[in-house]
Amino acid sequence: LNYGIFLDNSYQSDFNFGASNDRFSSFGAHGGEMDYYFFYHSKLADIINSYTFLTGRMELPPLWSLGYQQNRYSYYPETEVFRIAQTLREKKIPADGITLDIHYMDAYKLFTWNKNRFPNPAAMNKKLKDMGFRTTVIVDPGIKIEEGYGAYERGIKDDIFIKYPDGKNYAGEVW
């Protein structure tokens, strides 16, 4: 018997497909609506097709993103990034991406580049792409509190930061 069940419920759910008794199966949720869908087909591929027809089919990610990504804390300056990329190519180690950690930033401010370590990010990225690499930069969910820093100033102006119950902007440590 080939079937699939989709329980459309955000509450804690329990599924028992023969764990305690191989003649008994059950599923349920601790609240909410019991909206469920039952799929039956002779082929597993058809069950998955019916399920994704209902829930949607995601786009495939770019092929390069599924390949090996060279990453560590942290590659800098730009010459070190190129050295790593060249070494991977010389040793014929397959790699599709290189990730830059926090040291690419200017004083750890998101959406900025440290121009001493990475004087021309666009040219660096082009050269890496010509070598067959895609560049990914780390983006942490924190905006540095610093007068004159564009992202911080815009956040204050547009009043978009998370607030404490007393209305003051939330501040926390990222690193």
List PLM regions with ranges.
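Short, solvent-exposed turn/loop segments enriched in Gly/Ser/Thr/Pro and often Arg
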Residues: 98-104, 139-147
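Aromatic/His-enriched, Gly/Pro-containing loop or helix-boundary segments
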Residues: 106-121, 165-175
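Short acidic, glycine/serine/threonine-rich loops at helix termini
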Residues: 17-19, 109-112, 146-153
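Active-site-adjacent "subsite" loops/lids of carbohydrate-active enzymes
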Residues: 141-175
